[in-house]
Every structure is written in C-alpha cells, then in structure tokens.
C-alpha cells in the first residue's frame, strides 16, 4: 500500500470463511474513493483466491450487532429509523430515534451513528444513498424500521424506482446549473451555465479556492484537470452532443488502459469543458492532443483544477 499511496486508511483481518480481507476506506470522501477504486481494479487476480479486497468498508453487521464508543454501548435494537425515500435525489432521508445516542453531544452523536450505519449498509451506500439525517427526541407516529432493514429498502428503491446502481464512483453523475460571470477578464470555468459531474466536492473546492483534495491526489501521482475548447461556432442545439463526441473518443483511448476517467463536463458561453481524473498524465495529454488536433479550434487547452 505504501507503494501506491502516500497515506491510506485500512483495516485487515480474516473473515468467517477463512479468507484474508484488506479493507481500504475513503472516510466518506468521494475524491479519495476514486483513487481507492482505481487501486481495487488492479488488485492481482491470483490473490483473490485467498484474499478479499475492498475500496470501502462493506456492510456486514446483523441484528444484535453492537459497538462501544464515547462511553456508550449501542446495539441495533437501540436505534429506530424513520426512513423517507426521495426519488428526485435518489436518497433515503432519515430521522433517528435513539435515547442512547442523544446522551452524546452533537458531533459525537453523528460520528458514532455514521460508523454504526456503515457497519450495516456499507460505506458506499452511506455515501451514495443516504440524504439528510436528523435525530429526534421522541418516537414518531411514522412507521419505523430497524437499521438492518435499511439496506434491503435501498436495494428495493434501486430495483423498483430506477435508482442508479453503484459500481464505479466516476460513473454516477449529478447535474448542476450556474450563473455565468458578466465581468470582463473572466477566467476559465467562470462562463459555465450548466454541467454534470461525478464529484461535486472537487468543483466546490475549485470555486472556493481550496486545494487539499488536489494536493492529496498529487501526492499519490494523480491529477484532476479539464480540457477546454471554444464552442461559439458550434450550433447551440448541437453543443452538448459535440462535446460528448469528443469525450467519447478520449474515453475510448484512455479508460480501458487505466490512463484516465471522465468525471463529467460543462458548457459555458465561450468554452466547453471535459473533466478528468488522470493517472498517467503524459499518456493522457498525448492522446488528447491527437484527438483535439482533428478539430479546427482557435482556442483549446488543458488546465489542472488547482
């Protein structure tokens, strides 16, 4: 692991079947999860006979499972959930009734509950399918569910309501809209009015001028960046498909070879953008240059997010 990562959090043990397990955790960080998922894809095939590898904590706890933290002993019977599906956002919103958790201060309460929740539904389900979490002081008139019933409820929504099934963190997208700048002398991405992304925290960091995620990726040999090219001469009705065609060509020559993954794209009043997580920068730039050279762009380039 030290060869692959500058810093990584993991657990190691042996399961009931006698197989060793190496469990990495992104600690709830979606950008970090992408690096761990890439690592998982290249775990040596011959090791899988005796090992299980995970890029996030799996959910394995059953009814009656318990933990102790902050001086509180908590078992599944101590927690009642009032779950409300949100089909617009593909999330389950939770109200939590647990007198034992209410004994803790707010930060401790949320910290312990998230760790407890991960044990039952897995870290990925917590990240992808859990919306807001509120703690209530009294039982509700709503129908309550046990925490061990939550994962089947999520699976039912995936199957019945068409929620996206998590397989690759770079392939689950959400759309966004922005107000483009009206000032002169604007910089890259300030012209964007719509886009989609598989890693909203990265965009938030970019616009807020924060660099921790980008620095951490760089320490692990990974870059987050984007291609940009002018779109003013592209008919408005074709602008998204035009960007998509270029993205498809680059993806076809990079993703199968572990060079990069697309993270989404965006449309501005001057430029179109395609966002990437890049594992082999030199190979990626060579491929991108060759493909973009086939178009008659006056303005085209690459930029790191940082």
Predicted regions and their residues:
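Short amphipathic beta-strand and strand-loop transition segments with alternating hydrophobic
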Residues: 9-14, 77-85, 215, 263-265
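Short, low-order "capping/linker" segments at domain edges
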Residues: 60-82
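An N-terminal, globular interaction/scaffold subdomain
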Residues: 1-51
């Amino acid at each position: 692991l030290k060869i692959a990562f500058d810093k990584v959090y993991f657990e190691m043990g042996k399961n009931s079947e006698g197989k060793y397990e190496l469990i990495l955790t992104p600690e709830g960080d979606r950008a970090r999860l992408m690096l761990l998922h890439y690592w998982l894809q290249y775990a040596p095939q011959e090791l899988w006979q005796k090992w299980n590898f995970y890029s996030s904590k799996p959910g394995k706890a059953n009814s009656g499972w318990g933990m102790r933290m902050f001086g509180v002993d908590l078992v599944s019977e101590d927690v009642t959930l009032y779950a409300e599906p949100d089909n617009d956002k593909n999330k389950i919103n939770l109200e939590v009734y647990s007198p034992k958790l209410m004994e803790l201060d707010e930060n401790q309460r949320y910290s312990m509950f998230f760790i407890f929740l991960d044990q039952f539904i897995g870290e990925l389900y917590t990240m992808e399918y859990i919306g807001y979490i509120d703690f209530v002081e009294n039982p509700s008139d709503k129908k309550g569910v046990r925490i061990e019933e939550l994962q089947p409820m999520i699976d039912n929504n995936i199957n019945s309501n068409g929620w996206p099934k998590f397989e690759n963190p770079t392939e689950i997208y959400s759309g966004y809209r922005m107000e483009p700048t009206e000032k002169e002398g604007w910089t890259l991405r300030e012209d964007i009015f719509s886009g989609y992304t598989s890693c909203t925290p990265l965009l938030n960091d970019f616009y807020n001028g924060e660099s921790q995620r980008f620095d951490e990726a760089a320490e692990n040999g990974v870059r987050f960046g984007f291609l940009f090219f002018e779109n003013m001469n592209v008919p408005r009705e074709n602008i998204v498909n035009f960007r998509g065609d270029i993205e498809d060509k680059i993806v076809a020559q990079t993703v199968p070879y572990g060079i990069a993954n697309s993270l989404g794209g965006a449309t501005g009043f001057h430029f179109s953008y395609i966002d990437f997580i890049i594992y082999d920068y030199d190979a990626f730039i060579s491929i991108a240059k060759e493909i973009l050279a086939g178009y008659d762009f006056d303005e085209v380039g690459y930029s790191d997010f940082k």
